């Protein structure tokens, strides 16, 4: 997972811990009795030789890190991100912003779907304010495509990073007209020694005292995450819901290969269904696989190219489906991370300092 593999903001941590000698080789997890050099918590299939590096309580193996240390790092880093995400979510709810986190593999058609969705929303809900945050490692190509539709967009380039995080989204959102419109009025806040008023000109992610509410959806913020079916699954951005987009050109077993993403999603969109006549893609099997991972997952089939199924997508988005699906997806995601959290208790002794070593000879 990218919290500890080296692509997040704390990418030096694993190497630092490796230098400190905190790595504890896995015991009892190697089935054949023969452990590859430097391996930790790997399960080996005796009949095929296949390696499974997610066998430990942390569900990941990183050279230089014990399983307990890996879990602790994940909790620390994600805990900080989740606090920022909670601020984002509080703001979005207070101002009637429906924030959707679009996640998928590269090339699934996210940006094309966004352009089609923008056109459709303008026809049926011209009153809605729209904005887009684009995430890619490099270039502003996708943001330029969105801006060409007339909708404001901010491009986030993550460099070597493989996902967006809550602070990135907060910083990008502050630069959108959607944010300015939400804060066009002056907020009144009461303190113990009296009242004061101020305008929001500070970092939004750290603002936690909204005292007003908005009824219904007044605007939609689309967040197109970096194309990646692994890392974005565990990073809460403060969104109303995650929407996993799966192209029918990718194969129907993607939900089983990348279960964390589909467990965290409220909705799975099967895109490019106009290509089905030319492919051997079993739609029913794909949906079955996805619901093995997430029984509450809602599924829509559409073609961003032809517009087929887009009306159903808009209905889900604006008629409460996003909110209803988000609660179920949150429960599913919590179940999937329960094992690592429980595992840290069993591995607590690895985090405790060892006995002092006497310097006397």
UniProtKB/Swiss-Prot annotation:
Biological process, per Gene Ontology: protein maturation
Domain of life: Bacteria
Binding site for Ni(2+) 1: 2, 5, 7
Gene3D superfamilies per UniProt: P-loop containing nucleotide triphosphate hydrolases
InterPro entries in the cross-refs: CobW/HypB/UreG_nucleotide-bd, Hyd_mat_HypB, P-loop_NTPase
One of the record's GO molecular function terms: GTPase activity
Composition bias, Basic and acidic residues: 14-25, 189-213
List of residues binding Zn(2+): 162-163, 231
Residues that coordinate or bind Ni(2+) 2: 162-163, 231
UniProt function note: Involved in the maturation of [NiFe] hydrogenases. Required for nickel insertion into the metal center of the hydrogenase. Exhibits a low intrinsic GTPase activity, which is essential for nickel insertion.
NCBIfam families listed in its UniProt record: hypB
Protein known as: Hydrogenase maturation factor HypB
